[in-house]
């Protein structure tokens, strides 16, 4: 009987394919991909919804977007009277159409919607929620995922992504909607009157906040190459740099045009060195010093340097974090009670740098919403000077409550310009940090373990560390094991257990005098990540051996 119902559901979806907005994507998919759309179901989690286009409840299409929007409308109306919301969207396939669908559904429920007539960045959405004092915000993006993906991120009234509790409540409202094929969305002129143009003044205010943060960029002969990887950071980043009287940059023209197919990049992820390929070519032609890329929704950023011989130095997320923290420490020397926030899988390097400079630091779970929660809880006398995650997400000043590559681009250019005046580079600055606090190094191993056997292996690895914690790993003596699922930390040398004041998450962190390793399974994919952050000789060899020991 279940198989018959599934077949009937599939037939109903195929009958509605012409109205789904995604027929073209569905027809290009393999049989397995098509079937997965009918046999799976999109779920609204702490990061919203993200998935492929296609037919069925397991795919993004007109009907699943209407279901999401209807659930969110009921959620918002239950939370506040006369709610308002701002919607932004990126350059991906169907982002504009999904934005209009969501706006129509919300308007149908007497929710005032601010909707721009062009694409915007994710940090602009966070800022707009705060600037317009709306009850919520919606960002339509799939960040750096492949071209056949999109997603919906939901933000609360503070401009941060929804908390875990709020996400769970919104999810219940969405699930209560039921079958997306049975939704009827009447549209009338009265309802569409709730949809308002997005005020240009908000973008102007956002630019002013960044201009005030930067002040000025010193005159030097620094040359920059910038690529938006076909995303949303053009035109806002070039306009911002010009407003700061910095014009010594060249755009990778082929990649600075919005393109939902990401035609000229192998990867639209600034973590991936391949994302810089065309930027490197242009840097060599233009004798540029600094290369900067932002991901498609402009919340994350990567950098590289080109020396006089054309040699490229790529910086990982932890190294960029250390450079930016170092610069912010220099900029804020007059402030007392300075604070830096980072995720629990980010580097020991930045913590050592903070300690050396008498800057307090806090560690939070992975996910920038946890950083935003810390910012919200700051005392009046505390000054948050920097926050970051090792996955290339940075925030300098909290007028935005999410990762913000747009505010970081001029900040890193200003730092590089100052260094250039003294004949120094960012690589030199990083080396100076190492000389000051020690050469803490970091790497990440990501393992995909498919199927039931893969799931069993991931569970076995986590269980082993929980039930039989090692005394040492590759000659490194274990001091403590932090288990964020049980919210406990076990001190091996003292044989004591204490509580961790943190939300629960399936993460284990093993602490040594030399640093830490962390294990973090994905909640949505058959993946597990191993983070290694150590100050030790032969780091690369030690990291490889730790990885082999755990996953052999």
From Swiss-Prot:
InterPro entries registered for this protein in UniProt: A-D-PHexomutase_a/b/a-I, A-D-PHexomutase_a/b/a-I/II/III, A-D-PHexomutase_a/b/a-II, A-D-PHexomutase_a/b/a-III, A-D-PHexomutase_C, A-D-PHexomutase_C_sf, A-D-PHexomutase_CS, Alpha-D-phosphohexomutase_SF
Gene3D superfamilies xref list: Alpha-D-Glucose-1,6-Bisphosphate, subunit A, domain 3, Alpha-D-phosphohexomutase, C-terminal domain
Keyword annotations from UniProtKB, A to Z: Carbohydrate metabolism, Glucose metabolism, Isomerase, Magnesium, Metal-binding, Phosphoprotein
Cofactor note: Binds 1 Mg(2+) ion per subunit.
Residues where Mg(2+) binds: 143, 295, 297, 299
GO biological process assignments: enterobacterial common antigen biosynthetic process; glucose metabolic process; purine ribonucleoside salvage
Known cofactor(s): Mg(2+)
Pfam families reported for this sequence: PGM_PMM_I (PF02878), PGM_PMM_II (PF02879), PGM_PMM_III (PF02880), PGM_PMM_IV (PF00408)
Pathway(s) the chain acts in: Glycolipid metabolism; diglucosyl-diacylglycerol biosynthesis
Reactions catalysed according to its record: alpha-D-glucose 1-phosphate = alpha-D-glucose 6-phosphate
The family this protein is said to belong to: Belongs to the phosphohexose mutase family.
Function of the protein: Catalyzes the interconversion between glucose-6-phosphate and alpha-glucose-1-phosphate. This is the first step in the biosynthesis of diglucosyl-diacylglycerol (Glc2-DAG), i.e. the predominant glycolipid found in the S.aureus membrane, which is also used as a membrane anchor for lipoteichoic acid (LTA).
Protein name: Phosphoglucomutase
Organism: Staphylococcus aureus (strain bovine RF122 / ET3-1)
